[in-house]
Amino acid sequence: MAVSPKINRREHILQCLAQMLETSPGQRITTAKLASEVGVSEAALYRHFPSKARMFEGLIEFIEESLLSRINIIMDDEKDTMRRCQLVLQLLLIFAERNPGISRVLNGDALLGENERLRSRISTLFAKIETQLKQILREKTLREGKGFNLDEAILANLLLAFAEGRIAQFVRSEFKLKPTQHFDEQWRFIQHQLLQS
């Protein structure tokens, strides 16, 4: 497969890795298979990435930049607490749905047997998202004069667990059960429950 001059080799390797994660669910990706997919030798892969762990870190950096920058935009543009929560959850689910191979990284499925620091980085990413949700929920008291009856940390954890569960179903179903399926109805129910708490 020829690489257009506009796409650098490093990006192409990461795109091929994400594609292989999507088309080979449940299978471990070896550098030999990846090199074959990219159309280069394993040595050529290692000229761009010193290890397979660094390749996965490249994908994780893409995930972090994509999600956290968009969450910051949501925080700047939207002031309503419930709408912010909805948009953050929707962002996670749409991102996973549009990037099935990368959803395996988010879920941790693709990281089994890989370097522990990769799973740690994904855990840290989800902790940052949970902290954002907690902040959104805590600001409700400041913005609207009324908070929740339940601790915001517990509510933030519940919201994140919902999104992680939908992503896990997507991966487990080999990308057949879309994370956004029924989201609007589910969100209405969740929002109603949150406003009652």
Curated annotation (Swiss-Prot):
Residue spans binding DNA: 30-49
Among the GO molecular function terms of this UniProt record, one is: sequence-specific DNA binding
As for subcellular location, the record says: Cytoplasm, Nucleoid
* Keyword annotations from UniProtKB, A to Z: Cell cycle, Cell division, Cytoplasm, DNA-binding
InterPro entries found in the cross-reference section = Homeodomain-like_sf, HTH-type_Tx_Regulator, HTH_TetR, NO_SlmA, SlmA-like_C
Could you give a single Gene Ontology term from the biological process aspect?
Answer: cell division
Predominant subcellular localization, coarse grouping: cytoplasm
GO annotations of cellular component type: bacterial nucleoid; cytoplasm
In what residue span(s) does the HTH tetR-type domain sit? 7-67
| Family membership | Belongs to the nucleoid occlusion factor SlmA family.
This molecule's function is given as:
Required for nucleoid occlusion (NO) phenomenon, which prevents Z-ring formation and cell division over the nucleoid. Acts as a DNA-associated cell division inhibitor that binds simultaneously chromosomal DNA and FtsZ, and disrupts the assembly of FtsZ polymers. SlmA-DNA-binding sequences (SBS) are dispersed on non-Ter regions of the chromosome, preventing FtsZ polymerization at these regions.
**Identification of the protein by name:** Nucleoid occlusion factor SlmA
Source organism lineage?
Bacteria, Pseudomonadati, Pseudomonadota, Gammaproteobacteria, Alteromonadales
